[in-house]
């Protein structure tokens, strides 16, 4: 049994040690943030996006680009009213599309709640279409880490190729980066072979500075993709958010050599908007990102 020597200097050494280790941890994150150029202030980001789109949008608004975008879509159903029958019908539309337009690729994935992964797996006959499942207490992410890990592992076991989880924004807002990143790393481990998409919920983060920080934390925690939004309860994707995320991905790639994908979700209603996002990704990250493995 260890004998504790009580010091009489009046300081709580254990407490001081905790402070020290906390400040070392915080320094570690700031060190990572400092490797990235500061995000442009919000108004300047808007100006940069507008200039980029004015210059390049028209050249990308072509049938070829729209076909490429079609092949990068995650066809999604995430409602409280989802049933096996509805999900099966959705999968049938993907199966039926297969081979009807040789010049248009099928969607990249079908995204559902964990409960329906098995249904998609049974129904899906289309080749090379992946099964994506949300997990981790989607969409608020406010549950126990153990539950998130179990839900992720079960979805993968049922047949999910991709897992979409929301970053814990509560941890983010209180600068609790240690728990935030540890949790994401544990979820990543429970994905095994499946890809991890980390949703930042950019509409809740609001500022470009927050969006950049969240992108950096997600990437260093093992995200294969960073994704804008859940489409639930907060504003969806914006051009400014996509621009900021792309800039962070580019710097991360130059530092580590790792390519992280970007998924735009929530509020993309028109072909024009889809092409605008495509244009932002193309101009910042280049053509090598314009495929379903990274976009």
Model-derived segments and spans:
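Histidine-centered metal-binding segments
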Residues: 1-21
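A composition-driven signal for long, intrinsically disordered, charge-rich low-complexity tracts
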Residues: 16-40, 147, 172, 193, ...
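Conserved, well-structured core domains of diverse proteins
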Residues: 20-68
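Alpha/beta enzyme core
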Residues: 56-70, 81-105, 115-262, 269-295
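A short, histidine- and acid-enriched strand-loop-helix "catalytic/donor-clamping" loop
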Residues: 78
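Short, hydrophobic beta-strand segments that form beta-sheet elements in well-ordered domains
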Residues: 110-112
